[in-house]
């Protein structure tokens, strides 16, 4: 229980139970001790997205498939903080909650994994590519319309087993997860970053969600990485303006260099037959989160003017076949 008072008590970290989620929670636990002087323990919480494994994510519907139960535990004060893969975090919070910190971003790339084929171009016509994501499906089909993208659910180990068992010719994972779990070419013969693919908002970064009134909120904010927060804030503002969620075919990626923020994005149908794609750049101070959000909003409005919302409505009806 996290309901004990006192600024020096042990904190309770809420986490999903997958190996990747627990790696992330352990990482934050070590950061809390090293950088904040705080002791903590991890409490595993099963989410709706963890329980429903036989349905593609896009067909389950609803928001917060991997976060809602964690947020309920925050609100009831049964945990002090929740550690999320930021790409899974809805763009709107309940008023009592917010992100205390966004950690330094790992690689935001998506990654091609295969036992028999060295890259996406080497796959034969009709090859089966496994992915959880309409965004990935859209971009793979745009790149190679002859490939068959299929829903792939389960934790990373389950997905790798399906690849090894021949259910798929290749699978697509987030590069950050591959790096964190130290998956290498001894496990899978070919691991190739997909540089052409625009990632999901927040992909590669971790978010620490807390109650705003927590006495630990400001102490934990020291774990915030300014550059990652700046970029992710623009990405989340873009998706929020489009009224999209975590399971829709939207890719958006921000990069910050030399006081310039560059945003690139793609929106379209899951089969890649229709897409909108664009990029924008503006001068921004690294501390100016409002400016980065405004850039994301203005960029999204360009997409809306080109029919992005109508495209997303059609995409929602198609989902996975």
Curated annotation (Swiss-Prot):
GO terms for biological process: protoporphyrinogen IX biosynthetic process. It comes from the Bacteria. SUPFAM superfamilies: Periplasmic binding protein-like II, Porphobilinogen deaminase (hydroxymethylbilane synthase), C-terminal domain. GO terms for cellular component: cytoplasm. It holds the Pfam family Porphobil_deamC. InterPro entries: HemC (IPR000860), Porphobilin_deaminase_cofac_BS (IPR022419), Porphobilin_deaminase_N (IPR022417), Porphobilinogen_deaminase_C (IPR022418), Porphobilinogen_deaminase_C_sf (IPR036803). Binds 1 dipyrromethane group covalently. Transmembrane segments: none annotated. Keywords: Porphyrin biosynthesis, Transferase. The keyword Transferase applies. GO terms for molecular function: hydroxymethylbilane synthase activity. Belongs to the HMBS family. Tetrapolymerization of the monopyrrole PBG into the hydroxymethylbilane pre-uroporphyrinogen in several discrete steps. HAMAP family: Porphobil_deam. NCBIfam families: hemC (TIGR00212). This is Porphobilinogen deaminase. It comes from Helicobacter hepaticus (strain ATCC 51449 / 3B1).
């Amino acid at each position: 229980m996290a309901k004990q008072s006192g600024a020096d008590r042990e904190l309770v970290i809420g986490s999903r139970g997958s190996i990747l989620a627990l790696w992330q929670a352990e990482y934050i636990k070590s950061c809390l001790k090293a950088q904040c002087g705080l002791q903590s323990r991890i409490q595993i919480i099963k989410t709706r997205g963890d329980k429903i494994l036989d349905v593609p994510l896009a067909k389950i519907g609803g928001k917060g498939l991997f976060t809602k139960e964690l947020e309920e535990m925050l609100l009831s004060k049964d945990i002090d903080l929740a550690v999320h893969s930021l790409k899974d975090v809805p763009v709107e919070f309940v008023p009592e909650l917010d992100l205390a910190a966004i950690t330094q971003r790992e690689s935001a790339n998506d990654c091609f994994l295969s036992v028999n084929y060295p890259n996406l171009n080497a796959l034969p016509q009709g090859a089966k590519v496994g992915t959880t994501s309409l965004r990935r499906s859209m971009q793979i089909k745009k790149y190679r319309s002859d490939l068959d993208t299929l829903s792939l659910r389960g934790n990373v180990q389950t997905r790798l087993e399906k690849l090894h068992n021949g259910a798929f010719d290749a699978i697509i994972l987030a590069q950050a997860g591959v790096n964190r779990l130290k998956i290498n070419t001894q496990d899978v013969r070919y691991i190739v970053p997909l540089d052409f693919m625009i990632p999901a908002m927040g992909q590669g970064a971790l978010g620490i969600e807390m109650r705003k009134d927590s006495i630990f909120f400001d102490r934990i904010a020291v774990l915030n990485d300014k550059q990652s927060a700046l970029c992710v804030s623009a990405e989340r503002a873009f998706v929020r303006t489009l009224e999209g969620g975590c399971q829709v075919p939207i890719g958006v990626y921000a990069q910050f260099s030399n006081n310039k923020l560059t945003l690139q994005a793609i929106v379209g149908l899951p089969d890649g037959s229709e897409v909108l794609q664009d990029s924008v750049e503006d001068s921004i101070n690294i501390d100016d989160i409002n400016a980065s959000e405004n850039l994301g909003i203005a960029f999204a409005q360009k997409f809306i003017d080109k029919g992005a919302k109508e495209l997303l409505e059609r995409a929602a009806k198609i989902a996975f076949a």
